[in-house]
Amino acid sequence: MKTLSAIAAAGLALTVAAAGIARNPQFEGADPHAMMIGDELWIFPTGGPGGSWAADRFGAFSSRDLKTWRPRGELIRRDQIRWIKDDGAPEHFLWAPGVATRGGRYYLYYSVGPQNPTPSRIGVAVADRPEGPYRDSGRPLITGDKGFEAIDPMVFTDRRSGRIYLYAGGSAGATLRVWELKPDMVSIAREVKVATPPHFTEGAFMHERGGTYYLSYSHGRFNGPDYSVHYATAPSPVGPWRYRGAILTGDARHQGPGHHSFVTLPDGRSLIVYHRWDRAPGPGPFQGERVVAIDRITYAPDGRIRPVRMTDDDAPVLPARHGDTKKVNNR
């Protein structure tokens, strides 16, 4: 990996692959939310001047070929979120962004923590362009409570029903909760009671393929060797869940893979974008910065997701022409 000086100028301490062939890992960062916007793959990670451990702002990166990544500057900073200090906590950090789009606008959902001494919270900010600037909605959308940590938001629009769902939760309590959003994308319509699937810890992600809904999520301590990605399937976006097993686990070279996104390219190929530690010493807890990687996803004939082989290969190349696919819906 090479460092782009433009990132330092933008105040984002993330290392991005420079022009040329980018091999895994792609750049430093954690909790990557990825989505296709036009003919570009966009990645929204946790990171900032304090790295992913003490982030006070969000940035984004985009690529047309998965070889050259363009830093898109700051989306929003902690000091632009007016309500963030109203809980009296001595410090606040931002992590785990999730982005959704509706009606030509972009909605950035994010976690504010830590959980102690006050509950973690989820906020949402709005922009007319994916690179922002984002304007916060003015109030927290979700607040944690005893047994539930309000973290790791992910928004999914079910194209069958048109309903918009917010998935969140994990870590302390390891509880999944789901809400239906109002069409304005910044208000809660109601909470939908769901079961927490087996081995759920945090980082829920929902996508649909061929009428089957896939709920994938991270399991284990975030900086430990058992951190991994598992999944369950369902006939609806809210269950009932059928646990299917782990699809992304650590190996001798790559540790703690998780907090991921699924993306489908215009030609129908599927990718998983996730963070991991590479060559981390010892059995954990791991330290230092995590890195973002991209690997291929394949499905068995019965619809199961095949286990992912983590690679240090070139990232899959985006096709030259942008088309439309109906196989997977994650927006």
Label the model's feature ranges:
Residues 18-331:
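Carbohydrate-active catalytic/glycan-binding domains of CAZyme proteins
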Residues 1-4:
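Positively charged n-region of N-terminal signal peptides that target proteins for export
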Residues 7-15:
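Bacterial N-terminal signal peptides
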